């Protein structure tokens, strides 16, 4: 007990001489040597690693064009939403790798990653993307199956007699 008092007294003396300065963490921009902005997006079990750079609007997903990777046009329109909101269609080239999950989860992960990378490239886009709901991660995941039940919430049939 006396050792603790001595240690706290030493700390207080040290703080009296030099008060603590607040450590401010500045956000580090993830930019590589070729000027690409990097961000990760997540949705369900899918994780997308996204790099964007100023270009002509070319989008590559897992070494395929976006039309080859997502045959449905609605998926492509959803992925292009950040560019539509910020009015930057055909101004950025996007390269992304996606792993895990299904097609819908991968679409959401790419959308989230592109939004975060656009936010890093031009900080003025932050409010636009935030209001559009594109910067928040959708945390809904599949609920686990419980033992003694058929599914996550479905129970076995109840028999009164």
Swiss-Prot record:
Any one cellular-component term (Gene Ontology): cytosolic small ribosomal subunit
NCBIfam families: PRK00132.1
Single GO molecular function: structural constituent of ribosome
InterPro entries (UniProt xref): Ribosomal_Su5_D2-typ_SF (IPR020568), Ribosomal_uS9 (IPR000754), Ribosomal_uS9_bac/plastid (IPR023035), Ribosomal_uS9_CS (IPR020574), Ribsml_uS5_D2-typ_fold_subgr (IPR014721)
Protein family membership: Belongs to the universal ribosomal protein uS9 family.
Protein name as catalogued: Small ribosomal subunit protein uS9
Source organism of this protein record: Rickettsia akari (strain Hartford)
Keyword field: Ribonucleoprotein, Ribosomal protein
Family annotation (Gene3D superfamilies): 3.30.230.10
